[in-house]
Amino acid sequence: MGMVGRDIDDLPKNAANYTALTPLWFLERAATVHPTRTSVIHGSRHYTWLQTYHRCRQFASALNNHSIGLGSTVAVIAPNVPALYEAHFAVPMAGAVVNCVNIRLNASTIAFLLGHSSAAAVMVDQEFFSLAEEALKILAQESKSHYKPPLLVVIGDESCDPKTLEYALKTGAIEYEKFLEGGDPEFDWKPPEDEWQSISLGYTSGTTASPKGVVLSHRGAYLMSLSASVVWGINEGAIYLWTLPMFHCNGWCYTWGMAAFCGTNICLRQVTAKGVYSAIAKYGVTHFCAAPVVLNTIVNAPPEEAIIPLPHLVHVMTAGAAPPPSVLFAMSEKGFKVAHTYGLSETYGPSTICAWKPEWDSLPPIKQARLNARQGVRYIALEGLDVVDTKTMKPVPADGTTMGEIVMRGNAVMKGYLKNPKANEESFADGWFHSGDLAVKHPDGYIEIKDRSKDIIISGGENISSLEVENTLYLHPAVLEVSVVARPDERWGESPCAFVTLKPNIDKSNEQVLAEDIIKFCKSKMPAYWVPKSVVFGPLPKTATGKIQKHVLRAKAKEMGALKKSNL
């Protein structure tokens, strides 16, 4: 048999056989296949896929008319409203990069982001206009003579106080719908010439003190949009409830993915258990994503706000802080099917999933919940995932006990951090993306996070997983939410300090008795050195996606001062 020459690999790319990957094509296809199907619902507003496509083309055209295109960044400060959904397509259709800004950030942080990203335009929901206005004033003061005011567009919403919109318009901002009128609904948008072109910029300002700009590509967004939908088993025509903020990792890529599957997007400005249950009943919601704290809110909803049993199976994807098995069990008991995922802003959101195995079906529910609480295996678009010894970069044994760092590589990894070569060098060391999360690898190959490297508590030379302590505390009947951090300890160096939010029905008149009861509970369920030496009650500081801000709690624990010598 003759050998095939190199010419088998020398066939060139051309316009007929190669197109840069971009999720923008999903919208064009949805408008063609299901032009009259409802694409987006927000209050009384209903759009079809054809209308959404035309609106996005208008939006892109209007941006180009203001000389905003390739190389530009457009910041959007808004909750889950149609304009934010449209921006995910329209801004890159114009050739620009979309930067979805966390609405819970303060003005000084937003000023930093707008300056760091050189935002050419700022779109802001009317409710947050004063926040954007203050941020722009700070940016102008800091930039001085170099300041160039960005194009300012205000997004009106009938559910908000009309006075805030009136004020914004008086300052010279353009109303969003008026802005669209200046564009062409038949705008001939062009896909990127290179799929490595940037599509999105996000900032990792969640649980750390210093934000870093995460740059994502059209290629990565395309692959992760499909990968996220495939691993979750989303079917064509799914009805998706936006409980997860779209500004968090581009809504875990479901902003683009829902167009690929021609589904329906239900927008929620504010997330409450009542709102979630009502949407399930009213719209027939089939899927939603949420941080564990939202799941906790759902399972602890008052009976008058809940709908039990559910009218149909509802699929839920959760990520963020690892959910306690008790919460997963409670969600399952109420009729929700929870898929547990894990990821970071640097990996387009979730990039691993605890893929369900048929053999788990016959296990007791609590055992199922424990297995499902693991972070699992890689997404289809993530080619490399491992847990390694950071000193040697060798994989840890799959024994379920040896901890190492989670590392990743593949199409699900960001292009890099904007204007931060040092961070890029550190994050991409040895050809892997370093997550900073500590995990074990089980015999079945599934990984399970034990802690963030900075969240490990070192007490008397022994490592304590704050996550393990938290999971036990969630079993206490009075605990609604909990976060455990290190507190200085005169004898042990550090000891666990538990910050606890109590359930609404708990008598809070005697916190000392409650604290003693919680500590006693822990002593019966964990090694003595794991037991929290101090318990603090009150609401926990969180990001917009419900992640508990441990850096704030660590600072608070430090301010409390060192614990005096104890025998525990």
Curated annotation (Swiss-Prot):
Catalytic reaction equation(s): acetate + ATP + CoA = acetyl-CoA + AMP + diphosphate; propanoate + ATP + CoA = propanoyl-CoA + AMP + diphosphate; butanoate + ATP + CoA = butanoyl-CoA + AMP + diphosphate; 3-methylbutanoate + ATP + CoA = 3-methylbutanoyl-CoA + AMP + diphosphate
Residues binding ATP, per UniProt: 204-212, 340-345, 437, 449-452, 547
Tissue and organ distribution: Mostly expressed in glandular trichomes (lupulin glands) after flowering and in old leaves, and, to a lower extent, in stems, young leaves, cones and flowers.
UniProt cross-references to InterPro entries, sorted A to Z: AMP-bd_C (IPR025110), AMP-bd_C_sf (IPR045851), AMP-dep_synth/lig_dom (IPR000873), ANL_N_sf (IPR042099)
Domain of life assignment: Eukaryota
Any one GO CC term of the record: cytosol
Keywords annotated in UniProt: ATP-binding, Cytoplasm, Ligase, Nucleotide-binding
Region of interest (SBD2), ranges: 341-417
Primary location recorded for the protein, binned into one broad class: cytoplasm
GO molecular function term, any single one: acetate-CoA ligase activity
Region annotation (SBD1) ranges: 272-340
Subcellular location field: Cytoplasm, Cytosol
EC number: 6.2.1.1, 6.2.1.-, 6.2.1.17
Record family assignment: Belongs to the ATP-dependent AMP-binding enzyme family.
Function: Involved in the biosynthesis of prenylated phenolics natural products which contribute to the bitter taste of beer and display broad biological activities. Catalyzes the ligation of CoA on propanoate to produce propanoyl-CoA. Can also use 2-methylpropanoate (isobutyric acid), acetate, butanoate, isovalerate, pentanoate, hexanoate, 2-methylbutanoate, 2-methylpentanoate, 3-methylpentanoate and 4-methylpentanoate as substrates with a lower efficiency.
Domain topic, free-text comment: Both substrate-binding domains (SBD1 and SBD2) are involved in the substrate recognition, and are sufficient to confer the substrate specificity.
Protein name as catalogued: Acetate--CoA ligase CCL3
Organism phylogeny: Eukaryota, Viridiplantae, Streptophyta, Embryophyta, Tracheophyta
